[in-house]
């Protein structure tokens, strides 16, 4: 009676192996991560200017593309994508990095309050300034935000490289995406760790943005410190092989 009991697992293992081989031979049956839509679905285009363009100004390729869209499937737009004039991918990225515990509603509210606080502070400064100084005061919070982040972006960074059993901090040039990430990370870290207990996040963040806008503040100092460390370790630049 023991032989049939041993044959049953062997039969099932052989069947599982056969199914696995069949799946490998048919890649269309394999599960792909995030394959919510079939390959024939096109990406959504969220751009009002594209749809407002007159037909007479369209090229032959654009006309063909619009005719093709009438018969093709289009993916649903993400909940975070919008065609609003206030939509900004950089601010959206900063909001996602500032979010904690998946509470994006709170992160959006804090970001909106921060931009409002920046605008209020600049308008107070604008009203108190003379006619000549008013022309030099920026009041657009979106421009202030972008300029502040640009001032915080480091040009060169340090990467640990193992050489002879020791890790050396080798200076390397940073990509644009990495620069923007470090600027956002430093700004958020400064507002969280060095914020007074009774100071709200929008107030602290608006203050740091205005400081960075004028090339001042701890975030700018942190960028300069990284540049100094990279300058001090420039003798190790030959360890960079990529």
Curated annotation (Swiss-Prot):
InterPro entries the record matches: Ribosomal_uS7, Ribosomal_uS7_dom, Ribosomal_uS7_dom_sf
N6-acetyllysine: residues carrying this PTM: 228
Leader sequence residues: none
Gene3D superfamilies: Ribosomal protein S7 domain
Matching CDD domains: uS7_Mitochondria_Mammalian
Entry keyword annotation includes Mitochondrion: yes
Keywords: Acetylation, Mitochondrion, Ribonucleoprotein, Ribosomal protein, Transit peptide
Transit peptide feature range: 1-37
GO molecular function, one term: structural constituent of ribosome
One GO cellular component term noted in the UniProt record for this chain: mitochondrial inner membrane
Annotated S-S bridges: none
Subcellular localization(s) per the UniProt record: Mitochondrion
GO biological process assignments: mitochondrial translation; translation
Superkingdom assignment: Eukaryota
Family matches, as Pfam families: Ribosomal_S7
Family recorded in the similarity comment: Belongs to the universal ribosomal protein uS7 family.
Oligomeric and partner information: Component of the mitochondrial ribosome small subunit (28S) which comprises a 12S rRNA and about 30 distinct proteins.
Entry protein name: Small ribosomal subunit protein uS7m
């Amino acid at each position: 009676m023991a032989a049939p009991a041993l044959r049953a697992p062997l039969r099932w293992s052989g069947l599982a192996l056969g199914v696995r081989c069949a799946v490998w031979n048919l890649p269309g049956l394999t599960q792909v991560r995030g394959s919510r839509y079939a390959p024939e679905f096109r990406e959504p285009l969220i751009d009002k200017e594209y749809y407002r363009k007159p037909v007479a100004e369209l090229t032959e390729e654009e006309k063909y593309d619009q005719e093709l869209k009438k018969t093709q499937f289009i993916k649903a737009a993400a909940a975070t994508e919008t065609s609003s004039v206030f939509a900004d991918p950089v601010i959206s990225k900063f909001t996602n990095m500032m979010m904690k515990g998946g509470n994006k509603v709170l992160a959006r509210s804090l970001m909106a309050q921060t931009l409002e606080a920046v605008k209020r502070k600049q308008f107070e400064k604008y009203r108190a300034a003379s006619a000549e100084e008013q022309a030099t005061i920026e009041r657009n919070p979106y421009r202030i935000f972008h300029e502040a982040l640009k001032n915080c972006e480091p040009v060169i960074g340090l990467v640990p490289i193992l050489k002879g059993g020791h890790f050396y901090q080798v200076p390397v040039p940073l990509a644009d995406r990495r620069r923007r990430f470090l600027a956002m990370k430093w700004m958020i870290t400064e507002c969280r760790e060095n914020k007074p207990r009774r100071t709200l996040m929008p107030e602290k963040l608006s203050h740091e943005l205005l400081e960075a806008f004028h090339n001042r503040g701890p975030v700018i100092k942190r960028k300069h410190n990284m540049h100094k460390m990279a300058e001090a370790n420039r003798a190790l630049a030959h360890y960079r092989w990529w």
